[in-house]
Design a protein with these regions (language model features):
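C-terminal ends of transmembrane helices
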Residues: 57-67, 119-127
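Helix-adjacent hinge/juxtasegments
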Residues: 73, 81-109
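Alpha-helical membrane segments in multi-pass integral membrane proteins
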Residues: 109-120, 130-151, 158-179
Length: 198
């Protein structure tokens, strides 16, 4: 009788979530400083949207896919391509004159669909932690406020207020990402994430 050896494969890859959260968070803060009226839209925001908000999040999503994490895979890859699509919306009409720029109604529809997607993802965070609930909750509000602003042709005051709400969302994502890094390094809770009972 032959004894069959059982081989176990241990996953030693890093947790990609902090990369995704920080890519999202830093880019969101920088964009919403523009929305809040601190500076004009410029190449810095577009570069962050392509590189850290876009590519870095997509990489994090692919890494999470290998870990079998459906929620993180869906979130990071989706929002990574959101940033790339947002940059494309701004840049494409300038590169190809035949492409008409997005008007306020089409942008409202675009942002509302992302708000709907985020609202459903927000429900998933109730099985994760409070920090992610804040990130996805404030992001849901942000998308719908941006959509309302475009649909109604809201003035600068509304858009600036929306920008400050976006800053809250971005900083919440930065906190959540850095908390995961520091907690893992310390081997204990340094920055709480607010675990939920499952």
């Amino acid at each position: 009788m032959n004894d069959s050896a059982l081989t176990q494969i241990k996953d030693t890859t890093a947790n990609p979530a902090p990369l995704g959260l920080l890519g999202f968070g830093l880019t969101t803060v920088l964009l919403n400083l523009h929305n809040a009226g601190f500076y004009e839209l410029n190449a810095m925001i577009l570069a962050m949207g392509i590189c850290y908000g876009g590519i870095a999040q997509i990489i994090a999503g692919i890494m999470d896919c290998k870990k079998g994490n459906t929620f993180a895979t869906t979130a990071f890859i989706s929002y990574g391509f959101f940033w790339l699509s947002l940059v494309a919306l701004i840049v494409l009409p300038k590169i190809i004159p035949a492409i008409a720029p997005a008007n306020e109604i089409s942008m409202a529809a675009y942002l509302a669909m992302w708000g709907l997607f985020t609202a459903v993802m927000f429900l998933g965070t109730f099985r994760l932690n409070r920090a992610l609930q804040v990130v996805f909750g404030t992001l849901t509000v942000l998308f719908f406020l941006l959509a309302i602003g475009d649909a109604t042709g809201a003035g600068a005051g509304f858009k600036h207020a929306t920008g400050f709400e976006g800053l809250l969302c971005g900083f919440a994502a930065i906190y959540t990402g850095l908390a995961q890094v520091l907690n893992e390094l310390a081997g204990k809770i340094v920055l709480p994430l607010g675990p939920v009972k499952k």
